[in-house]
């Protein structure tokens, strides 16, 4: 019996929150941590799922009976991938799949997309099915949207399947065009620090869907297919509803920030706001950090998806010397990403832990986010 081992990474989003489903720009990078799927083919048309993180009885699914809503809980994500592959015309066969993960669940680092993509690659390989990765990302997104019921965009699956080591990936969510830009913070003595606030988020809850509906209404009123297609910030003034105005302003400015950071990271590219040569890496990370902090304020005040622990973490990190910080993921819980110099790293961690405990909150957990390769076969 052939056993295959497939790994798909989580992701951190350097810039562009809630811009993906608005057809704007996003700038994620893959993490070293992710989900591993150890899989063997079955001849009985069943998918049998086990997870080390959910050590209950195995979840057994008949491929022929899969339909949206037929599987719930964590198993809905891999089941949804099998359903979406078959619905897209790919005759994947049954498999026994053991899942393991070193990603925190509900921390805004796309554990669900990593689960989907590792299983999708395993099912395709065991079934002798070839799917281009760009298309597989869309299939995994369909699984999350239609089978699981989370109205997410394309960023998470694209990051899991298409990222490169030592790069961030600028994705135009309108055209799905990708530009890989160098992102090597360690070479500049900088750490991309993920702060898990220990407040779990769930994107199937109503607030995420409400934000998406508000964006769609704002786009309709502005006469465009999606807010990400608007480049003139003054266009938001045409929106009479102050809530819709704020939502649109966030999408337009965050998409612009994603492009600005991507341009800044390109080798030898001068850019507005910095010296012409800009080989001072500290100067570059101060520039990027400033944009991260601007993005957090936009997510907090205009898009209203932040939460108290994230706001405190961002403020404390910056006060302790971080270049900048922002919440990442869909919001309402999850993590903060901070750019911190190596010499300030221990102090930032210590101050954040002390600040959380003093407020009666669980101590945050930390993860050094190293830009890593996309999903791949391990064995």
What are these regions (language model features)?
Residues 1-7, 11-18, 22-25, 63-64, ...:
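Gly/Ser-rich oxyanion-binding loop with an adjacent helix/lid
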Residues 1-11, 15, 36, 40-71, ...:
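C-terminal nucleotide
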Residues 18, 30-31:
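N-terminal cofactor/phosphate-binding cores enriched in small/glycine residues
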Residues 23-30, 211-212:
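Short Gly/aromatic-enriched secondary-structure transition segments
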Residues 47, 113-117, 335-339:
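FabD-like malonyl-/acyl-CoA
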Residues 97-99, 195-197, 336:
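A structural signal for short, well-ordered beta-strand segments
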Residues 332:
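Glycine-rich phosphate-binding loop
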